[in-house]
Regions:
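Gly/Thr-rich phosphate-binding beta-strand-loop-beta motif of the actin/hexokinase/Hsp70
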Residues: 1-21, 110-125, 130, 241-268
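Short glycine-rich, Thr/Ser-proximal phosphate-binding strand/loop in the N-terminal lobe
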Residues: 10-40, 94-95, 274-297
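Helical "lid/coupling" subdomains associated with nucleotide-phosphate turnover
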Residues: 17, 44, 134, 214-251, ...
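N-terminal phosphate-binding loop and adjacent alpha-helix
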Residues: 28-53, 104, 128-129, 296, ...
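Phosphate/pyrophosphate-binding loops at sites that engage ATP/ADP/AMP, CoA/4′-phosphopantetheine
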Residues: 49-59, 117, 146-151, 241-242, ...
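Short beta-strand-loop/turn "lid" adjacent to the catalytic site in phosphate-handling enzymes
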Residues: 56-83, 389-392
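Active-site phosphate-binding/coordination module
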Residues: 74-95, 108, 114
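Internal, well-ordered domain-core segments that constitute the primary functional module
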Residues: 109-193
Length: 451
């Protein structure tokens, strides 16, 4: 039996039709529908099925970032400890972290949480057996806070703090009938970060309480087919890919609105044995740069490149910078803009190169001055994703990806022997969707990304 993997994206709905052995039979994309309050997201899905000639009996697995994806607010104890751990876990779960609050919520701080319009709140705080006062205070505040409504209509809260206070925190939230999901502590002890339980709980909250309420479809079939937020599925695919080759993997996904970086690393030496940082690194991690996109945020890419000394400004600007800025201004004003000739394609690829370089630097850079940079020296595979790379020729892809592999201006070791390739048929999300229920099939799909 064939299987259709679908990603409901913010701009395009993409699909991969797979044979029962994982062979890719067809891939395609159609514009996403239903995101502007008109139509239904399944209209575009049906057009995709028709274009791919999907058999009526094909099974379907889907992920979604349509309608703004998964918006997450993190409420923690200390900004540099549990709140930072919660933020990292939220990103690894595929969320867009729209707000981080630290300490006991005041009236103003609670209002800021509400103003961020989260789909889910991740409540963390305290190591296991440690301070519980702030966690319980914040649980009580959140119980009374009108985020998304009251009672069953309120935004769900994932409780992933001090396990010895978890039952009491859940009871405080239940007193106002707020939906909750219990998880293990994201920071059970100093120097240890435990993401999996909270990541699964965020996924559960997204599927049970969020995706059906996005107003994307009146048909319950949509919510029934979606299994994950898209970045969550992609990280799962990166994990599958890393398992295939046995080496460290990094993925750079350059999009129209954001640039996401994923890495799956195997710690070695002192990275594996010493707890050097208060919040340990996530070895399977994602960062999202909301200001680095080739269309909506094209001008911000140039600003960030100047800050990173990748691009000159004013009298220091290199020849061609004015043309690049003019292209970025057009792209910002016309998000649907596509290059029409070799000159415009070169400008778009240069914008992608800058976005990728800045995003990887930020991914590797420590969150706090006392922490270590992310060890990328053992990356053996760099995968590029995003339409700009999928539609580029070999020299265009090399222009972007080889620059990433050669960049060491952040002060860390660059990958020594990494090979670069592009996820040409956009298969990482499909591998991630299949990873839990059909790992052999997921590996067969991921293997088709490698040469």
């Amino acid at each position: 039996m064939t299987l259709l993997a679908v990603d409901f994206g913010s701009t395009f709905t993409k699909g991969a039709l797979l044979a029962d052995d994982g062979t890719v039979l067809a891939t395609g994309a159609t514009p996403t529908t239903g995101t502007l309050g008109r139509g239904d997201v399944l209209d575009g899905y049906r057009a995709l099925r028709a274009a791919l000639q999907v058999p009526a009996d094909a099974s379907v697995r889907a992920c979604s970032s349509a309608g703004g994806g998964l918006r997450l607010a993190v409420v923690g104890y200390e900004a540099t400890v549990t709140a930072q751990a919660g933020r990292r876990v939220g990103l690894s779960a595929g969320a867009k972290v729209v707000h981080v609050a630290a300490g006991a919520l005041t009236t103003d701080a609670a209002a800021a949480v509400r103003a961020s319009r989260p789909d889910i709140v991740l409540l963390v705080g305290g190591t296991d057996g440690g301070n519980a006062d702030v966690l319980l205070h914040n649980a009580e505040r959140l119980a009374r806070l009108a985020v998304g409504g009251h009672g069953d209509h309120a935004v769900p809260v994932v409780v992933a703090g001090n396990v010895e206070a978890r039952t009491e925190a859940l009871a405080l939230l239940a007193a106002t009938s707020r939906p909750t999901v219990a998880a293990d502590n994201v920071l059970p002890q100093i120097g240890v970060i435990a993401p999996e339980s909270a990541r699964a709980a965020i996924r559960q909250g997204f599927l049970h309480h969020v995706i059906g309420g996005k107003g994307l479809s009146r048909d319950p079939a949509f919510a029934a087919m979606v299994q994950a937020a898209t970045p969550d599925a992609v990280l799962g695919g990166v994990e599958v890919l890393a398992g295939l080759g046995g080496g460290d993997v990094m993925v750079v996904d350059v999009g129209g609105a954001t640039t996401d970086v994923y890495s799956c690393l195997t710690p070695e030496g002192e990275d594996a044995s010493l707890r050097k940082d208060v919040v340990a690194p996530l070895w399977h991690a994602r960062t999202v740069e909301g200001d680095l996109g080739l269309r909506w945020n094209a001008l911000h890419v140039l600003e960030a490149a100047v800050e990173e000394h990748l691009l000159g400004a004013g009298p220091d600007a290199a020849p061609g910078t004015a043309d690049l800025r003019a292209w970025a201004e057009r792209a910002h004003e016309q998000p649907g803009l596509l290059p029409t000739d070799a000159t415009e394609r070169a400008l778009d690829l240069e914008l992608a190169r800058l976005a990728a370089l800045v995003a990887v630097r930020r991914h590797a850079r420590p969150a706090q001055p006392t922490e270590s940079p992310r060890p990328l020296a053992n990356v053996t595979t760099l995968v590029g994703s995003g339409g700009v790379l999928r539609h580029a020729d070999a020299s265009g892809r090399d222009h972007v990806l080889e620059a990433v592999l050669a960049d060491h201006a952040g002060g860390w070791k660059v990958p020594r022997e990494a090979g670069a390739r592009v996820d040409e048929r956009y298969l990482l999300f499909a591998a991630g969707l299949l990873a839990a229920e059909a790992p052999d099939l997921a590996r067969a799909v991921a293997a088709q990304i490698l040469p």
